[in-house]
Amino acid sequence: MTRLLIAASGTGGHLFPALAVAEALPEDWQVRWLGVPDRLETQLVPARYSLFTVNAGGLQGSRLSKAVQLLLLLAAGVSVARLIRRERIQLVLSTGGYIAAPAILAARFCGVPTVLHEANAIPGRVTRLLGRFCGAVAVGLPAAAGRIPGSRPLMTGMPVRADFLQSQPCPAWVPEGRGPLLVVIGGSQGAVGLNRMVRAVLPPLLEQGCRVVHLTGRNDTEVGQVQHPLLVEQPFSDEIPGLLQHADLAVSRAGAGSLSELAVCGTPTILVPFPQAADQHQEANAACAAEQGGAVIVHQHEPEATVLQQTIQCLLGHRLGHPDADPSLLPSMREGMERLAIRDADQRLVDLLQSLLD
């Protein structure tokens, strides 16, 4: 029996890829999960795997705050080292979050190899600093490979949940009609700015027969400002795979998790990078999709959402019946997104883990 410790914490972008890998492991592997109290993993993980938590955070704020956080990091590392020895852990997999640093340092101290997966095109601070201490570093986007000092990253892609890889029906609650389906994914971070941009351009689209599903995120207070029979607004959906597979076009942030899901579904996308993302990594993620021809980038600061409106009208023009529209745009973008996709990313990471045992 192989004992694996998965260190993944915080957002869905860290957790869902790790869960996808865990589900792809051989049956004789035993998984222990390392996270942080009061984060998303405390809701998603315990039903499937044994969850252990330690207090960990980023080194941010004033000098005093950073000093306190550094002490907490060292204490967390000691706790993780004890866990590794007590549970006789043989391998560690980290997909990021605050827990990554103490997990990598503790594994190094205990002589246990770590696989670190970096999802974004611009690696985070932990990856840049600690990647050299890992047995292997994997990347989700090729642009990250040359930005991790002291390591030779392997391109594995970004694991997604199994239901994204299987054909799904269009959700029954999607508005009926012959018009194109536009899916907007607001996301949990920075959703307000994107949601306002989208609402500014919806009325003329709806009047032309465009069907719209707007996933606003949980913190949106402006739901209901635009009302129309062809518009559905809700915070979140468990049926995102079916939505993306049947969408003619999506509008989304450019987080690595969302981008990988859009790619495996082959969904033509307008990407609006979150402008406050660390190191502008969403801008770099979006550029990877645009280079493949699968996405168009629109920036949030564009005045009055004019560029967003023009872009949607251009891409959906043929489906909306505009006589001068180019019918090849969406099929070409769909092919571009499919080129970006790596559908066996979970198995590639499993193979990488197994290689460290040989």
UniProtKB/Swiss-Prot annotation:
Keyword flag Transferase: yes
Annotated metabolic or biological route of this protein: Cell wall biogenesis; peptidoglycan biosynthesis
Listed EC numbers: 2.4.1.227
One GO-annotated biological process of the protein: lipid glycosylation
Reactions this protein catalyses: di-trans,octa-cis-undecaprenyl diphospho-N-acetyl-alpha-D-muramoyl-L-alanyl-D-glutamyl-meso-2,6-diaminopimeloyl-D-alanyl-D-alanine + UDP-N-acetyl-alpha-D-glucosamine = di-trans,octa-cis-undecaprenyl diphospho-[N-acetyl-alpha-D-glucosaminyl-(1->4)]-N-acetyl-alpha-D-muramoyl-L-alanyl-D-glutamyl-meso-2,6-diaminopimeloyl-D-alanyl-D-alanine + UDP + H(+)
InterPro entries: GlcNAc_MurG (IPR006009), Glyco_trans_28_C (IPR007235), GlycoTrans_28_N (IPR004276)
Pfam families: Glyco_tran_28_C (PF04101), Glyco_transf_28 (PF03033)
GO molecular function (one): UDP-N-acetyl-D-glucosamine:N-acetylmuramoyl-L-alanyl-D-glutamyl-meso-2,6-diaminopimelyl-D-alanyl-D-alanine-diphosphoundecaprenol 4-beta-N-acetylglucosaminlytransferase activity
Keyword set, alphabetical order: Cell cycle, Cell division, Cell inner membrane, Cell membrane, Cell shape, Cell wall biogenesis/degradation, Glycosyltransferase, Membrane, Peptidoglycan synthesis, Transferase
Primary location class: membrane
Keyword Nucleotidyltransferase: no
Binding-site residues, UDP-N-acetyl-alpha-D-glucosamine: T11, G12, G13, N120, R161, S188, Q282
Subcellular location: Cell inner membrane
Family of the protein in this entry: Belongs to the glycosyltransferase 28 family. MurG subfamily.
Function: Cell wall formation. Catalyzes the transfer of a GlcNAc subunit on undecaprenyl-pyrophosphoryl-MurNAc-pentapeptide (lipid intermediate I) to form undecaprenyl-pyrophosphoryl-MurNAc-(pentapeptide)GlcNAc (lipid intermediate II).
Protein name: UDP-N-acetylglucosamine--N-acetylmuramyl-(pentapeptide) pyrophosphoryl-undecaprenol N-acetylglucosamine transferase
Gene (UniProt): murG
